[in-house]
């Protein structure tokens, strides 16, 4: 289910505060966050946000196309290494 429109988008208050400080000062420093559930708002465009994926921080440069999505969508948590194959598949 989608979030109710009357509630508005969720953005962690500390993340929002850090991004606003970057915008006001004109800096483009990387902001680290563990809040993967925070929604990307138009204020975030042009900022680089390092999103934690459980092991490390993945830098995400926010563009206009990302507005309305969640930060966690751009920081994959699983790495697919391929299915196990037969070792000597070609030999008979």
Swiss-Prot record:
InterPro entries: Ribosomal_uS19, Ribosomal_uS19_bac-type, Ribosomal_uS19_CS, Ribosomal_uS19_SF. GO terms for biological process: ribosomal small subunit assembly; translation. GO terms for cellular component: cytoplasm; small ribosomal subunit. It holds the Pfam family Ribosomal_S19. Residues 72-92 are annotated as: Disordered. Belongs to the universal ribosomal protein uS19 family. This is Small ribosomal subunit protein uS19. Residues 80-92 have a biased composition (Basic residues). One of its GO terms (molecular function) is structural constituent of ribosome. It comes from the Bacteria. Keywords: Ribonucleoprotein, Ribosomal protein, RNA-binding, rRNA-binding. Signal peptide: none annotated.
């Amino acid at each position: 289910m989608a979030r109710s429109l009357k509630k508005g988008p969720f953005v962690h208050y500390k993340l929002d505060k850090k991004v606003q400080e970057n915008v006001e000062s004109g800096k483009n420093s990387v902001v680290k966050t563990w809040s993967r559930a925070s929604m990307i708002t138009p204020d975030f465009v042009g900022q680089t946000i390092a999103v934690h994926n459980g092991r490390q921080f993945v830098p995400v440069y926010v563009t206009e196309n990302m507005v309305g999505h969640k930060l966690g969508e751009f920081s994959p948590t699983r790495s697919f290494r391929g299915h196990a194959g037969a070792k000597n598949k070609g030999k008979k």
